[in-house]
Amino acid sequence: MKEKIRTLQGRVTSNKMNKSAVVAIERFVKHPIYGKFVKKTTKLHIHDEKNECSIGDLIEIRESRPISKTKSWILVKILEKNIF
């Protein structure tokens, strides 16, 4: 049975590294006691081979083999460019 490839969408928060970027993934989680939905943010380091993403871009990433100590996600495509 084949495993499903994990893909996520997020905003680029930093691209100061060469061929790398930091992406913030936002998700809503229900509080176990109060029932309110709370926004949680996860930061992931991604591999950007062509240095094409910039801060504020909405991008799609997929999981891959470990590329370095902290990078195990690869840029698939840029969904929306930042206009600023």
From Swiss-Prot:
The keyword rRNA-binding applies. It holds the Pfam family Ribosomal_S17. One of its GO terms (biological process) is translation. GO terms for molecular function: rRNA binding; structural constituent of ribosome. Keywords: Ribonucleoprotein, Ribosomal protein, RNA-binding, rRNA-binding. One of the primary rRNA binding proteins, it binds specifically to the 5'-end of 16S ribosomal RNA. Belongs to the universal ribosomal protein uS17 family. Part of the 30S ribosomal subunit. This is Small ribosomal subunit protein uS17. It comes from Buchnera aphidicola subsp. Schizaphis graminum (strain Sg). The lineage of its organism: Bacteria, Pseudomonadati, Pseudomonadota, Gammaproteobacteria, Enterobacterales. The gene is rpsQ.
